[in-house]
Amino acid sequence: MTPDIRPLVAGNWKMNGTRASLDQIKAMAEGVKGDLSARVDALICPPATLLYVATALCDDSPLMIGAQDCHQKQSGAHTGEVSAEMVADCFGTHVIVGHSERRTDHGEGDALVRAKTEAAHGADLVAIVCVGETEEERKAGRTLDILKRQLSESLPDQATAENTVIAYEPVWAIGTGLTPTVSDVEEAHAFMRRELVSRFGAEGGKMRILYGGSVKPSNAKELMGVANVDGALIGGASLKADDFLAIYRAYEELTA
């Protein structure tokens, strides 16, 4: 954790979830409440097909709803795409950009991630910008070089602590059950903090840096207690309300 930074626990449902899954979001909305919700933010990013209904379920809850991606353009002949304005029109508050699965499956590079981040900001959304190294890059000792490049090229100059969140996701840890050591996570997050402060000054010191990569109830408290880890971006464990809320409630002791 970073003193004076409000943590964010975010769930990315990826290509999972139909209307039958809305009961999980309802349970999450009911579980995110009380004193903890005044200290820790919670967010779920379901498929775009569920955005509007999900936000309606959270009308009386602090649980926020966001999108998993957006197009870099406001509108136009881009079949199958969803713009940041459309996300905002569904009352979404955040959008994930640059997730490793987008970078790998769709060949999205840093320049495109930067354009999507700018589009999110233009729609008054908070951009969750994902960065992280592959297994090959890690074995070659290039983790910090990759993070430096991705932060430099994916973040626009107008990024602030209010409109931008960083998510560190070691690609080799996503969906594999593998997790970096606490010291590895601490080193990566400390490095990113220094890079953000170097570029953005005091504003960079206030930006939230989430950890993502096989986060689950059993390791959440340990990971989220690491210096400069300001929350989590959760994959599979966010599909079930019990698991998501267990991770969220790990902050009961951490923020007490």
UniProtKB/Swiss-Prot annotation:
It comes from the Bacteria. Gene3D superfamilies: Aldolase class I. The active site is at H99 (electrophile), E169 (proton acceptor). It is found in: Cytoplasm. GO terms for biological process: gluconeogenesis; glyceraldehyde-3-phosphate biosynthetic process; glycerol catabolic process; glycolytic process. GO terms for cellular component: cytosol. It is an enzyme of class 5 (isomerase). InterPro entries: Aldolase_TIM, TIM_sf, TrioseP_Isoase_bac/euk, Triosephosphate_isomerase, Triosephosphate_isomerase_AS. It catalyses: D-glyceraldehyde 3-phosphate = dihydroxyacetone phosphate. GO terms for molecular function: triose-phosphate isomerase activity. Its EC number is 5.3.1.1. Keywords: Cytoplasm, Gluconeogenesis, Glycolysis, Isomerase. Pathway: Carbohydrate biosynthesis; gluconeogenesis; Carbohydrate degradation; glycolysis; D-glyceraldehyde 3-phosphate from glycerone phosphate: step 1/1. Substrate binds at N12, W13, K14, G175, S214, G235, G236. Belongs to the triosephosphate isomerase family. NCBIfam families: tim. Homodimer. Involved in the gluconeogenesis. Catalyzes stereospecifically the conversion of dihydroxyacetone phosphate (DHAP) to D-glyceraldehyde-3-phosphate (G3P). This is Triosephosphate isomerase. It comes from Rhizobium meliloti (strain 1021) (Ensifer meliloti). The gene is tpiA.
